[in-house]
Amino acid sequence: MIELHNIDCMEYLATCEDNAFELAIVDPPYTNNADGLKAGYNRSQFNYQALKSPPNEIFLKQLFRVSKNQILWGFNYYLDLLPSTDSVICWWKHQNGHFSECEYAWSSQKKSRIFDRAYQKDQFNKIHPTQKPVKLYEWLLMNYAKEGDRILDTHLGSGSIAIACHNLGFDLVGCELDTDYFNAAKKRLEQHQSQLRIPMQ
């Protein structure tokens, strides 16, 4: 079941029992300054106000309480708030320009891996400035989750993780504070689900 909430993730986390989720995969804002976000986007295209709350100790304490394992994108921007780890995930994009060629994620699990796939900007229509490919989330789930695991995403963003969980049969709870992003992600998931239901001719 895919369960999406248009809510502040802190409000939702407060309602969760300890270890309610086997795995949290989170892509939070990395900075409290919109200008510090990834360059190259048309500022009028996205709502940067929704991206100005980077992780803090209170958020991380709650996240670690409700989930048994965690994957946190952009951890190098808030490394001082996290426990030390030998496990780092690298998404290698094979691209040039304003964007970083590699994005890093912290993992509580004892394995480091590289997702080495060419980044194709035209593979989806962007609805969020830090949108990641569905294939990346599918890879994370196949390598870091087990069948039957319940997944948490506190910053749903574009909803790529929701599509990946739907494709692979994982239960997901996703939270998104910004109403516009939430509605866009929900619509994107619904369109994907409806396409899968179209009978073959």
Regions found by a protein language model. Give the residues of each.
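Conserved glycine-rich SAM-binding loop
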Residues: 157
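Class I S-adenosyl-L-methionine-dependent methyltransferase catalytic core
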Residues: 1-142, 146-152, 160-201
